[in-house]
């Protein structure tokens, strides 16, 4: 069975872009939100359709989402969001692939990549920069889905990861990762 993971980050309280992202990711088995969920933070302009309460409602309607704490996420957010907002590094496995999720602001990227390799991750997913990235560092896939609502590289974006079992092989999988613009 093919597993689909939807990845978004840095929604910063924009309801229209959160809804557009959800629409693109509606067929996914699980969602990863890589942080900066509700607030725009002191360095960003207000995103289009800024409506943290609306985003809370949408998030609380979702069943299968993992949320990483970003630098703009406050303690109070956990009182209104029913899913855990996890600090630091989250190691999780989906379809035989090990993911390390981290917002990407606490340590240097080099250190975060080293952590991912030390923890045996196949894929490291970061946010924070609002810039899309997808590349290999030795055997590690490094992905940043960019920002859903306040991109710094011109286009609002999400990512979809597809994990397909290989016939007759219980350990290896094929993986496709696509960055998708949501303009």
Predicted regions: what they are:
Residues 4-94:
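Core catalytic region of metal-dependent phosphoesterases/phosphodiesterases
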Residues 12-19, 39-41, 72-78, 106-111, ...:
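Active-site environment of divalent metal-dependent phosphoester hydrolases
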Residues 32, 66-68, 125, 141-143, ...:
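Hydrophobic/aromatic beta-strand patches that form the interior of the parallel beta-sheet core
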Residues 79-84, 122-124, 150, 167-169:
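Short linear motifs in intrinsically disordered
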Residues 95, 114, 119, 136-138, ...:
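Binuclear metal-dependent phosphoesterase catalytic core
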